[in-house]
């Protein structure tokens, strides 16, 4: 199966290299309302340049701003970025400490622009394990942009798809146990309201950078019918052309949701 996926990815990459899309081209087609991105490759980007891994993470922060601005200009309604997974705590302490400072640096630097651009900041994930300084920066950004009604910039921070599903199942089980919910009333629609993304539509497009072909425990429920675009480009090298390319590939797909 893995070989089949790799062959398919190589075919997609070869085909993609034949076309280049402009912003005007993309605006003529369907724009995904919700785009999710697994921002991968910061460490490898730094290693290729004989730099510490944290240099790659810092460079990747600049790409977050550029991508957010472009997505907003194109009319995307929700941009969800996988910033830190529940498994990332296993990394070296120095790297984790730096990653926990990045949201603070990003928001302190770019929050005025996000407010001006009518972007609303949100977060999904287990906030209880986050350092106080990280949480303060996020809470301020969420509060300062709460009245904005433009694109939602949704950071998945200390997030894990399996944990999210288990938590939702436990909440539903508690309601059944206490008698406030009949088990027969539980369906996909109700289950979705117990997820961290309860108020958001599912992503139509998932992009992963760095050439890896896996979900890494990201939005396992929500991406059931998402279109996937895998690119070999490392996240710090991800530019406007690459984002437009992913959207162009999305617009060439036929989304049938199990039909013909």
UniProtKB/Swiss-Prot annotation:
One of its GO terms (biological process) is polyprenol biosynthetic process. Its cofactor is Mg(2+). One of its GO terms (cellular component) is cytosol. Binds 2 magnesium ions per subunit. The active site is at residues 40, 88. It comes from the Bacteria. Substrate binds at residues 41-45, 53, 57, 85-87, 89, 91, 208, 214-216. One of its GO terms (molecular function) is magnesium ion binding. Mg(2+) binds at residues 40, 227. It is an enzyme of class 2 (transferase). It holds the Pfam family Prenyltransf. Its EC number is 2.5.1.-. InterPro entries: UPP_synth-like, UPP_synth-like_CS, UPP_synth-like_sf. CDD domains: Cis_IPPS. Keywords: Magnesium, Metal-binding, Transferase. NCBIfam families: PRK14830.1, uppS. PANTHER family: DEHYDRODOLICHYL DIPHOSPHATE SYNTHASE 2, DEHYDRODOLICHYL DIPHOSPHATE SYNTHASE FAMILY MEMBER. Catalyzes the condensation of isopentenyl diphosphate (IPP) with allylic pyrophosphates generating different type of terpenoids. Belongs to the UPP synthase family. Homodimer. This is Isoprenyl transferase. It comes from Bacillus subtilis (strain 168). The lineage of its organism: Bacteria, Bacillati, Bacillota, Bacilli, Bacillales. The gene is uppS.
């Amino acid at each position: 199966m893995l070989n089949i996926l790799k062959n398919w990815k190589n075919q997609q990459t070869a085909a993609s290299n034949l076309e280049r899309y402009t912003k005007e081209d993309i605006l003529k087609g369907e724009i995904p309302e919700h785009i999710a991105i697994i921002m991968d490759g910061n460490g490898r980007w730094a290693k290729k340049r004989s730099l510490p891994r944290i240099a790659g993470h810092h460079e990747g922060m600049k790409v977050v701003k550029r991508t957010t601005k472009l997505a907003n200009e194109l009319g995307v309604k929700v941009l969800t970025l996988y910033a830190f997974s529940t498994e990332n705590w296993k990394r070296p302490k120095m790297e984790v400490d730096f990653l926990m400072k990045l949201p603070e640096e990003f928001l302190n630097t770019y929050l005025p622009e996000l407010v001006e651009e009518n972007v609303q900041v949100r977060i999904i994930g287990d906030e209880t394990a986050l350092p106080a300084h990280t949480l303060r920066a996020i809470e301020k950004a969420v509060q300062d942009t709460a009245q904005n009604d433009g694109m939602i910039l949704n950071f998945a921070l200390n997030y894990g798809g399996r944990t999210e599903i288990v938590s939702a199942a436990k909440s539903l089980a508690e309601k059944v146990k206490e008698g406030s919910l009949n088990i027969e009333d539980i369906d996909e629609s109700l289950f979705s309201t117990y997820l961290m993304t309860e108020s958001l539509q599912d992503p139509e497009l998932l992009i992963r950078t760095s050439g890896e072909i896996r979900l890494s425990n990201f939005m396992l429920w929500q991406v059931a019918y998402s279109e996937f675009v895998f690119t070999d480009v490392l996240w710090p090298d991800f530019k406007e052309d690459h984002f437009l390319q992913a959207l162009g590939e999305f617009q060439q797909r036929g989304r049938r949701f199990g039909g013909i």
